[in-house]
UniProtKB/Swiss-Prot annotation:
Residues 338-380 are annotated as: Disordered. It comes from Sus scrofa. Vitronectin is a cell adhesion and spreading factor found in serum and tissues. Vitronectin interact with glycosaminoglycans and proteoglycans. Is recognized by certain members of the integrin family and serves as a cell-to-substrate adhesion molecule. Inhibitor of the membrane-damaging effect of the terminal cytolytic complement pathway. It is found in: Secreted, Extracellular space. Residues 1-19 form the signal peptide. This is Vitronectin. Hemopexin repeats lie at residues 135-179, 180-227, 228-285, 400-453. SUPFAM superfamilies: Hemopexin-like domain, Somatomedin B domain.
Length: 459
């Protein structure tokens, strides 16, 4: 028996080492470790790679900082009509001196003189200047991996924050993306890499953190076989989990096509790139028991490639026959919950409204100053549930309050999709594929709710 003792000791040590490698004990803050057989990082639920004791050891929670509790255009909870009256009065106060100044500077024409015919204004290079609130239709919208929204119109592009256009925009598409505008469509994949695709004519370009990938542009017929050239709009959706497949909807004329990606990047492949905040927000929600809902929302019956076209107005109820642009909104949580006592709202609370965590600022050196004043409306009315990261119910800032709570089990995630047509936009519930019925109703003004343009005078 004596010779067996060393063998038993070795077997015991090997078992202990194996058990330690397959446990999250002491590993909850270590992040992803490729050499380990199972993982304890915050994305392991999505990749279905968690150790068996992940929940017990790491106690993951979907907390108030991980979820959005209203659609993109419903981030404020204080009274919509009061805000409208406030904005209108401010605009009237600011409009009077501007009009007077213009009146004083207008030259008086002599009888023999005639005013020159109106024409488009151009810059020194002969490029037509962009007018923010012109009401002209947009060509594309997309939500970049850092949470910023980019809008494309004609030769120009805009970066939008929660309230208006960011300082320094519009800029020429060619100066920012290296492509001469206009473009036809754009989308950003919702996976750990978060690459952005721009479409124009028969070609498409792919960008990683704003840098064009090698060997691009490519032909649409090669990279997206079965999808037509000159598309009008594109819309990307995530996979329900790592075992699922991502989808893109392409729209052209009165029809739309569904394209299914055959694979998504692995966890190891994403270690070398900056994380996608949009994807991280989605993946963190895998911690809760919403697998069935995610499968319902993001399931695809195709094994990859394009699916035969269908009619827009038949499947997306409430939309016009044709659309100019489309974009998936942030997933938000719908349901009932007890509201904590509401402290007095401060000015700083009203101004807060960050979409994603602090990594959002990691862009291509864009200005992120929020000092510019905006007339932008809240993009809709409100829901009396939770909050975005920095604002609680009613737009209140709870950063100074100790609040640790879980999303109630009765809640469920809602995926909104935005469609833009002409000077208006629609919000659609992906699960029902119907335009949301809210007040004020859809369609709504793009200029007012997305660009921060003044509210029209209400008589």
């Amino acid at each position: 028996m004596a010779p067996l003792r060393p063998l038993l000791m070795l077997a015991l040590l090997a078992w202990v080492a194996l058990a330690d490698q397959e446990s999250c004990k002491g590993r909850c803050t270590d992040g992803f470790i490729a050499e380990r057989k199972c993982q304890c990082d915050e994305l392991c639920s999505y990749y279905q790679s968690c150790c068996t004791d992940y929940v017990a050891e790491c106690k993951p929670q979907v907390t108030r900082g991980d979820v959005f509790l209203q659609p993109d255009d419903e981030y404020r909870a204080y009274d919509y009509h009061e805000e409208t009256r406030h904005n209108t009065s401010v605009q009237e106060e600011q409009r009077i001196p501007v009009l007077l100044a213009k009146t004083e500077e207008t030259p008086v024409l002599k009888p023999e003189e005639e005013a020159p015919p109106p024409g488009p204004q151009t810059d020194d290079l002969g490029v037509p200047e962009e007018e923010l609130c012109s009401g002209k239709p947009f060509d594309a919208f997309t939500n970049l991996k850092n949470g910023s929204v980019f809008a494309f119109r004609g030769l120009y592009c805009y970066e939008l924050d929660e309230k208006a256009v960011r300082p320094g925009y519009p800029k020429l598409i060619q100066d920012v993306w290296g492509i001469k505008g206009p473009i036809d469509a754009a989308f950003t994949r919702i996976n750990c890499q978060g690459k952005t695709y721009l479409f124009k004519g028969s070609q498409y370009w792919r960008f990683d953190d704003g840098v064009l990938d090698p060997n691009y542009p490519r032909e649409i017929s090669e990279g997206f076989k079965g999808i037509p050239d000159d598309v009008d709009a594109a819309l990307a959706l995530p996979a329900h989990s790592y075992s699922g497949r991502e989808r893109v909807y392409f729209f052209k004329g009165k029809q739309y096509w569904e394209y299914v990606f055959q694979q998504q990047p692995s966890r190891e492949e994403c270690e070398g790139s900056s994380p996608s905040d949009v994807f991280a927000h989605f993946a963190l929600m895998q911690r809760d028991s919403w697998e069935d809902i995610f499968r319902l929302l993001f399931w695809s019956h195709s094994f990859g490639g394009a699916i035969e076209p269908r009619v827009i107005s038949q499947d997306w109820l409430g939309l016009p026959e044709q659309v100019d642009a489309a974009m998936a909104g942030q997933i938000y949580i719908s349901g009932s919950a007890l509201k904590p006592s509401q402290p007095k709202m401060t000015k700083s609370a009203r101004r807060s409204g960050k979409r994603y965590r602090s990594r959002r600022g990691r862009g291509r050196g864009r200005g992120h100053s929020r000092s510019q004043k905006s007339h932008r409306q809240s993009r809709s009315t409100w829901l009396p549930w939770f909050s975005s990261e920095e604002t609680g119910p009613g737009g209140y800032n709870y950063d100074d309050y100790k609040m640790d709570w879980l999303v109630p089990a009765t809640c469920e995630p809602i995926q909104s999709v935005y469609f833009f047509s002409g000077e208006e936009y629609y919000r659609v519930n992906l699960r029902t594929q119907r335009v949301d019925t809210v007040t004020p109703p859809y369609p709504r003004s793009i200029a007012q709710y997305w660009l921060g343009c003044p509210v029209p005078d209400q008589k």
